[in-house]
């Protein structure tokens, strides 16, 4: 007998470190009752099930998905389509629960509605993350989209392997317009590590594009700052003024592209239909050879506390590892959170999301159009905004997801993931955050130590605009925190 669905509650997410003060949580025995979904959905072991652990339904479905830039909008979209709603704020925990540092812990799932649906349907963190990224491509065209470049980092707790996802080098489709890479990149990731059928992941974003979504505050602000030139009629009123927060936007052309992509059997074909339509719009030939996305072993750096993983060049991952290694070797005080590092002429607009389950499987995704609304060139036949990422040799300074695993030999080792969105300054602050985490957790420390609260003295906002996500798995718990504190609502089940 399934447990009745309870009202959804959203909470503010707090910066977290192992030494922070305790916070009560729902008792494990009570929470596990809500995790017994349809057991038949989790019995198929014929495919690669990223992060799945046999024999424990709670650990299979205990997943967390946090969307940095777009989860608040995804929450509102699905709420306005008749889903259960909740109130902002925190809920007093029941007495008698065990304690953790402040933040969000759960034995079950704490996710966005888009990701929640895919997990309930039997998906894993890769399904949830890819599905949510495609929803963001619809509802946050200023930060991401089908025209964006994606980087990803996936850690599979069952194998201990970490894999980097790249879109391939940037390539010009037409002067000032970058070749779109999102669909083949996400399709490749899902084909290797996902569990649900690919078409299932496109149901949500296709519905949002076809039936419409409500413009949220970040998108409305971006429209005011950028102006509507090149963005009409998608994001404009009939008189040419930008849509404000709460206005409804539809993108039926994009919905048609997504329906076509749902039928693609391979990652190469996933973007071909879109590319043909774009070439027709622009009056150019389809490139004879286009960069293909890749999955490759992640860059590694052994540290006393475990092993760090990140994405390879031309992302900022290798440079960040070098900075971390130098800081750890020197033994000097933790550097300024905003060092003069990875200077770029452009401060790109980017989007990030993270997914983690309580077994320690982690997916980090970050994407960018290079600047707000990319090139601001709206393809009339596809509804896609193209990026202006056209330089092959340019370092993607906005892309540097990091994962710290306590030990490769221990399948139950703690896992920490960090991913940032915004300007390169936020990535520098992420380096500072990880150094503080390593300093607070020496190699001999095996468990959380509940001490008085030690609020971080610096936040990424001191460097620039953006969001920093921190996700973790510890003793069969999924945990998340973020800076700014209230950037990212979540939904539990």
Swiss-Prot record:
One of its GO terms (cellular component) is extracellular exosome. Cleaved by autocatalysis into a large and a small subunit and the autocatalytic cleavage is essential to the functional activation of the enzyme. Pathway: Sulfur metabolism; glutathione metabolism. It is found in: Membrane. Its EC number is 3.4.19.13, 2.3.2.2. Gene3D superfamilies: 3.60.20.40. Keywords: Acyltransferase, Glutathione biosynthesis, Glycoprotein, Hydrolase, Membrane, Signal-anchor, Transferase, Transmembrane, Transmembrane helix, Zymogen. GO terms for molecular function: glutathione hydrolase activity; leukotriene C4 gamma-glutamyl transferase activity. Residues 442-455 have a biased composition (Low complexity). Residues 1-54 are cytoplasmic. Coiled coil: none annotated. The chain crosses the membrane at residues 55-75. Residues 19-52, 83-105, 442-464 are annotated as: Disordered. GO terms for biological process: glutathione biosynthetic process; leukotriene D4 biosynthetic process. The keyword DNA damage does not apply. Residues 20-32 have a biased composition (Acidic residues). It catalyses: an N-terminal (5-L-glutamyl)-[peptide] + an alpha-amino acid = 5-L-glutamyl amino acid + an N-terminal L-alpha-aminoacyl-[peptide]; glutathione + H2O = L-cysteinylglycine + L-glutamate; an S-substituted glutathione + H2O = an S-substituted L-cysteinylglycine + L-glutamate. Residues 76-493 are extracellular. Glycans are attached at residues 161, 370. The keyword Nucleotidyltransferase does not apply. Heterodimer composed of the light and heavy chains. The active site is located in the light chain. Hydrolyzes and transfers gamma-glutamyl moieties from glutathione and other gamma-glutamyl compounds to acceptors. Belongs to the gamma-glutamyltransferase family. This is Glutathione hydrolase 6. It comes from Homo sapiens (Human).
């Amino acid at each position: 007998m399934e447990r009745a669905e309870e009202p959804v509650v959203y909470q503010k997410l707090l910066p977290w470190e192992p030494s922070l003060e305790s916070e009560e949580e729902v008792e494990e025995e009570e929470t596990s009752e809500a995790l017994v979904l349809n057991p038949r959905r989790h019995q198929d072991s014929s495919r690669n099930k990223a992060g799945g652990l046999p024999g424990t339904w709670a650990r299979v479905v205990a997943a967390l998905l946090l969307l940095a830039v777009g989860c608040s909008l995804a929450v509102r979209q699905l709420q306005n389509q008749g889903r259960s709603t909740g109130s902002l704020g925190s809920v007093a925990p029941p007495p008698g629960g065990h304690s953790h540092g402040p933040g969000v812990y759960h034995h079950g799932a704490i996710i966005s509605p888009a990701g929640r649906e895919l997990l309930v349907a039997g998906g894993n963190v890769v399904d949830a993350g890819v599905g949510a990224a495609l929803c963001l491509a619809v509802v946050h065209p200023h930060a991401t989209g089908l025209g964006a470049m994606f980087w990803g980092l996936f850690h599979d707790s069952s194998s201990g392997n970490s894999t980097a996802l790249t879109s391939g080098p940037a390539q010009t489709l037409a002067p000032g317009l970058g070749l779109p890479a999102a669909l083949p990149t996400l399709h490749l990731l899902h084909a290797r590590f996902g569990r649900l059928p690919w078409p299932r992941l496109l149901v949500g974003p296709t519905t949002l594009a076809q039936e419409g979504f409500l413009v949220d505050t970040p998108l409305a602000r971006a429209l005011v700052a950028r102006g509507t030139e090149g963005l009409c009629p998608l994001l404009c009123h009939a008189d040419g003024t930008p849509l404000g927060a709460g206005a409804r936007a539809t993108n039926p052309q994009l919905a048609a592209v997504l329906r076509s992509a749902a039928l693609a059997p391979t990652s190469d074909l996933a973007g071909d239909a879109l590319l043909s339509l774009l070439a027709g719009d622009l009056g150019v030939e389809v490139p004879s050879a286009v960069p293909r996305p890749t999955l490759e072993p992640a860059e590694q750096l052994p540290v006393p506390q475990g092993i760090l993983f990140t994405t390879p060049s031309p992302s900022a991952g290798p440079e960040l590892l070098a900075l971390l290694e130098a800081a750890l070797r020197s033994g000097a005080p933790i550097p300024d959170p905003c060092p003069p590092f990875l200077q770029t002429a452009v401060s790109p607009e980017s989007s990030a999301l993270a997914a983690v389950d309580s077994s320690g499987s982690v997916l980090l995704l970050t994407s960018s159009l290079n600047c707000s609304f990319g090139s601001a060139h709206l393809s009339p036949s596809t509804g896609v905004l193209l990026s202006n990422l056209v330089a092959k040799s340019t370092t993607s300074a906005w892309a540097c997801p990091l994962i710290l695993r306590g030990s490769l030999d221990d399948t139950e080792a703690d896992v920490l993931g960090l991913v940032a969105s915004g300007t390169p300054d936020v990535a520098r602050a992420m380096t500072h955050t990880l150094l503080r985490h390593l300093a607070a957790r020496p190699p001999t420390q095996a468990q959380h130590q509940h001490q008085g609260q030690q609020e971080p003295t610096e936040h990424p906002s001191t460097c620039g605009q953006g969001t920093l996500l921190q996700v973790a798995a510890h003793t069969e718990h999924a945990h998340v925190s973020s800076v700014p504190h209230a950037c990212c609502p979540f939904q539990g089940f």
